[in-house]
Amino acid sequence: MSGDPSVVGIVGEWLDGAGIKRSDTATGKVNVRLVERIDQAVVNQEEAYNLTVSQEEISIEAVTEKGVYWAVQTLRQLTDRSTREVRIPCCEIIDWPAFGIRGFMHDTGRSYISLEEIKREIEILSLYKINTFHWHLTENQAWRLESKIYPQLTSPENMTRYPGCCYTQEQVREFLDFCRKHHILVIPEIDMPGHSAAFTRTFGCDMQSPKGKGIIKELLAEACDLFAEEPYFHIGTDEVHFTDPDFVPEMVALVRSKGKKAISWSPGCEYAPGEIDIAQLWSYMGKPKPGIPSIDSRFRYANH
């Protein structure tokens, strides 16, 4: 096997898992190469790849490590191990995604799901080139993300469903490492100021009160630091009556001060271009707005 040292390990892991032995004297070759661009890919060059399988060679060309990873996922799908021999059909595949974010969400605020289960799902979904996990961490029922500043948030008495079940910061860091290995972007979400009964039970105040706003700013800053390498943070803002017109702008400013882009549900808080970075459409009432990038998730959610 030859190629760029930064990416040959991805292919080597697949070879080992497929039971394909590596040898310097083997007649079949595997070549991995990073290139400036994949000419046929009209969008999302960073995920594009050119995979060629012949009788003599497996060749992968990609612009980034992520493109190599998706090429290997395609090889996993092509590999036939139904007999004692490992078979891969000869082919040439030039592939790139139409959409930069291809994701799934778990509402673990309502219903706790173990990280072991989520990891299994990520391993499966990454085979199909799903590249984003939206992690809804807080709800009326529970606050699932450990806080070192306010540990009482995850106390069993402040949860009405799956009491005591939460994700520690150490677990989150390990999980993020796992996601990076599978080239999964994680979008964490703390829903605010609505869907926050767990917050109110804990502190005896609403997020939009002066006391509550001070607390949620500390929590949001702590969470942004925990998810330091993730480029986005979701702040919710749906299904709530706003009593403090400065609440959302201040939260967006805090997220941006941490070097991240802020995402908000739509319908939710109303924004003009520049006031939010991405709107995530969640129902038929959510409409794309000129000047505001959007993620289209309409008609794809089931509250549970």
Predicted regions and their residues:
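Conserved beta-strand edge residues that scaffold enzyme active sites
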Residues: 29, 139-140, 192-194, 269, ...
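Catalytic-core regions of glycoside hydrolase
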Residues: 64, 237-304
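Substrate-binding cleft of carbohydrate-active enzyme catalytic domains
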Residues: 99-258
